[in-house]
Amino acid sequence: MSLSRLFVPQSSSEPTSGPNALSVEAMFSQIMDVVLKSRAEIAELRHECTELRQANLSLERQVREGITSQIRSPHLGTPGFNTPAPSSPQLRAKSPFLHSSSIPTLAVPPSVHIASPLGDNTVISYPYGPNREIPGFYVVIPAGGAGTRLWPLSREGHPKFLLDVTLQGRSLIQATWDRLLPLTGAERLAVVAGPGHVKSISEQLPDLLQHNLFCEPGPKDSMAAIGLAAAILAQRDPDAVIGSFAADHMISGTDAFLSAVSEAVLVAQKGYLVTIGIAPSHPSTGFGYVRLGDKLGIPEAPNARLVSSFKEKPDARTAAAYIATGSYRWNAGMFVTKVTFLLDLLREYKPELAEGLMKVAAVWDVDEGQRNKVLEEVWPGLEKIAIDHAVAEPAALEGRVAVVPATFGWDDVGDFSSLAELLPAEANQPRILGDSGLVLTEQVAGGIVVPGSGRLVACLGVDDLVIVDMPDTLLVTTRARSQEVKRLVKKAKDSGWRRLL
């Protein structure tokens, strides 16, 4: 049926054909041509927008992590577990996935005025001098882990903090050391680790003073690790302020990070347990949250607020609701406080744990034999609990916990999906951790491939896969299920594959 018959009224007084009918048909034909052409143009624009959006996301990740191009390396014949020790923390070591790397040494800007990324106050001042060192401030790096979340890339003997998982030429703990060194110097930078990791940490951090490497006999979660360091440092310097920062987190934006830590130290000196709240970039269900309370009104720390409450990892709907309010920040597990205040909180909320840690600290620097004896007696009976649950949450209810909101980039690299976000890639292509020459793909989008065995990994027509090919183990899963890898580790252990863990 013609368009004219559909739209031209029919009556006995009007002809069904003629000049008018032809002109109407021609008009609608032109309209249809325009509509079809517009549809084609819109489809093309949508395609271009999609490509631009994907390219922008890739570029943002690269800029955020300081990566401007993917570093390619010749074939490595080893699993790449160890990052060889540098001659100094300021010299970049070889990556376990790269043949060589030329990353610039850590630079300390000469200015003491740093632009703040926090909305209300555009500029804050470092009162500690141009080298950023903060007198009386000690850094504690808890370095633990069972190597389950990035298995089989990470193992019990080589957890993720010992690996260069971002192709930057430094392991995560080396990057953490580099980041915090300007605030303290090596003399006031301590690491808490288990006996199985002490040797590797000493090799990767040759400037770490041995009396600042605190070996805990077994894992007791973050409260015992941080509490042990606090108790020891309190014996050495009762006026010390300590900051605890995990060994295996990724941080981008050094100026913003140092700005937030410096502000947290100023607040801690006023008698608070201070955490640093990360501005959430998406409604994550894998992180805990901090709810912002009233501003503290401290002139030297204008961004600091009370912590209204801590929230456990929420479901997706709750996380989205948190972000919509603008009053929540991710809880990154960074805490800054006076050692005496932390121990006072511990005595109040966990007196038995506090008593045990103080017994150990009392003999720590006296005699190694006596230290080991007390550790054998005390450590097995200590409560296994996180610092959040032990002191931060109950203290927040009494108005004794503060938060410094910050906007530097942060990720705890909790699974292969989050690791993939930190690596560069072409649009719609999988991320490659290692030698990209060992990976061939055809019609493959997203995902991450770790060619750790040295053999070729070929993928055809699969999207968002996680493929970790090590000399002794092959893992294949999806990015959506990557948080469940630790279930496989448990199953491997129960099935007698303990040697692969």
List the model feature ranges, each with a label.
Residues R5-Q10, E14-P15, Q210-L296, L343, ...:
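Conserved beta-loop-beta/alpha segment of the NTase-like Rossmann-fold superfamily
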Residues G293-R329:
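A short, charged helix-loop
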Residues E187-R188, V241, R400:
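Residues at the starts of beta-strands that form the adenosine-phosphate
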Residues M1-G136, T340-L501:
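Left-handed beta-helix
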Residues I173, A229, D248, V290, ...:
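Residue-level signal for inorganic ion chemistry
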Residues V24, L36-S38, E51, S58, ...:
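N-terminal glycine-rich phosphate-binding loop and ensuing alpha1 helix
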Residues P142-A143, V192, G243-A246, T275-A279, ...:
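Short beta-strand segments
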